[in-house]
C-alpha cells in the first residue's frame, strides 16, 4: 500500500498531492507558483537572519 502525501499550497491553501502528477508542487498551479516567485523577487518574503556581510571588506569609499 502506497501512502499518498497531501500538502497545502503555500499560496492559497488548496490540497496538493505530492508526486509527479503535480508538476508545480508544493503549489497547486503555475499561477500560485508565479505569485510566490514575485513576492520573493519584490523582497516581500525573506529568510530571517543576520545581514550578509560576505562581500563587505569593512570599509567605505566615503571614508577616504
From Swiss-Prot:
Zn(2+) binds at residues 9, 12, 28, 32. It comes from the Bacteria. Residues 54-64 have a biased composition (Acidic residues). Transmembrane segments: none annotated. Binds 1 zinc ion. Gene3D superfamilies: Erythroid Transcription Factor GATA-1, subunit A. One of its GO terms (biological process) is regulation of DNA-templated transcription. One of its GO terms (molecular function) is DNA topoisomerase type II (double strand cut, ATP-hydrolyzing) inhibitor activity. Belongs to the DNA gyrase inhibitor YacG family. Inhibits all the catalytic activities of DNA gyrase by preventing its interaction with DNA. Acts by binding directly to the C-terminal domain of GyrB, which probably disrupts DNA binding by the gyrase. HAMAP family: DNA_gyrase_inhibitor_YacG. This is DNA gyrase inhibitor YacG. It comes from Vibrio vulnificus (strain YJ016). The gene is yacG.
